[in-house]
A protein has these predicted regions:
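Extended beta-solenoid/beta-helix repeat architectures
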Residues: 1-231
Length: 231
């Protein structure tokens, strides 16, 4: 059935339900399994896995691992001591995972921190720090954000100018990575040791130590490539 929490709830074992609405505080000592939507404007803590079809978090959710097969919208806080398995997710609040994140589509308008991320489509306009690999088919990054990744693998990556952001002098590059590899790469405000691609465009604010390209390399608007190599 449906569970509503407006004050406080403590469950010593697992909680199974069709829907969960929490505007108060819920603590589940086992796992949470929800066949429908979990809606949280309060606080939910789950000792084991939190699994749901849909999720809408404006409060805080913390679990050992998070699994959402459908759509997840988080304007609050989502934390996982393990990994996250997501369908289509949008974080305008904060997302922190100590394990890897796997998603079909991931949009970061707030902040994200994870060891590694894999997605079919990845879009960011906020802040992220990915210690290891960001692997996605299509990556779009707004120039107004701040992004750090160990390595990036993709089919296409575009750093695009945000029409609503006027650069008045940056503290640091928009994107920093050790290596970036893909078919089509369009870079702005990017610092990387190695960039590998078929079609590579290095634009304003870029400092790239080495570019290895197979088809075409374009350097424009003051972008810097220290060592271009056609492979």
């Amino acid at each position: 059935g449906e569970v509503r929490v407006s004050a406080s709830l403590r469950v010593d074992g697992d909680l199974r339900c069709d829907a969960l609405q929490c505007s108060g505080s819920a603590k589940i000592e086992g796992a949470l399994s929800c066949a429908g939507e979990v809606r949280c404007s309060g606080s939910v803590k789950v000792a084991d896995e939190a699994a749901m079809q849909e999720g809408r978090f404006s409060g805080s959710v913390k679990a050992q691992s998070l699994h959402c097969t459908g759509t997840l919208q988080c304007s609050g806080s989502a934390k996982s001591e393990g990994g996250m398995q997501l369908g289509k997710a949008r974080f305008s609040g904060s997302c922190a995972a100590e394990g890897d994140i796997h998603a079909e589509e991931l949009e970061i308008a707030g902040s994200l921190r994870a060891p590694a991320v894999e997605a079919e489509r990845f879009h960011a306009s906020g802040v992220f720090r990915i210690d290891g690999l960001l692997n996605a088919g299509e990556i779009t990054l707004s120039r107004g954000g701040l992004y750090q990744a160990g390595d990036i693998g993709c089919t296409t990556l575009r750093v695009v100018q945000d029409a609503h952001v006027i650069s008045l002098g940056r503290r640091k590059r928009a994107l920093e990575a050790q290596s970036i590899e893909g078919d089509t790469l369009e870079l702005l405000d990017t610092q990387a040791a190695v960039v590998r691609g078929r079609f590579v465009c290095v634009g304003a604010g870029c400092v790239i130590d080495r570019v290895e390209y197979s088809e075409d390399l374009t350097v424009e608007d003051g972008g810097i490539v220290k060592e271009p190599v056609r492979c």
